[in-house]
Amino acid sequence: MNAGAMGGEFCDLVENVTFLMPDGRLREMAGEDLTVGYRRCSEAREGVVLRARLRATGRSSQAEVRRRIDEFAQRRWDSQPRESSAGCIFRNPADDSAGRLIDRQGLKGESLGGASVSNVHANFIVNRGGATAEEVIGLIRRVRSKVRDSSGVVLEPEVTLLGRSWEEAFN
């Protein structure tokens, strides 16, 4: 995963990273050698990130850093749900917003068991209480299908499944 928000991506700051591979060995890589793209890092699919060294980007006073943290936190507080979620579910397609496409289908509030499309931001699925992984995946499947059927846009998941691929989950 190459996490990002508000115009920046995590991998832009990585100097090096250490992965724990499935066979138990450690793999270290320089940031510039990572295969990254929008919300993805190929190497992170092969192993688990144990640590990363980040590079600083300029110098700011402690007060300026605190002001920017507070500003970003307020923007998130104003635009994202407060319930438990995994963050944005789908990647934004070219020239559009996944949340806008989902909202156009009237899917805010759509539920499956304890999982529900957020009323605050349609690209979030929130846990209203006791949601299982299968309920969340089922709701993701339903939302993806409704958007595809109405607009022709196939939304791609941004979140990572553990233990199986999205291809398996969608079939």
Stretch-by-stretch model annotation:
Residues 20-138, 145-171:
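Phosphate/pyrophosphate- and phosphate-bearing ligand-binding catalytic cores of soluble enzymes
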Residues 1-15:
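A gly/ser-rich beta-alpha-beta helix-loop segment of oxidoreductase catalytic cores
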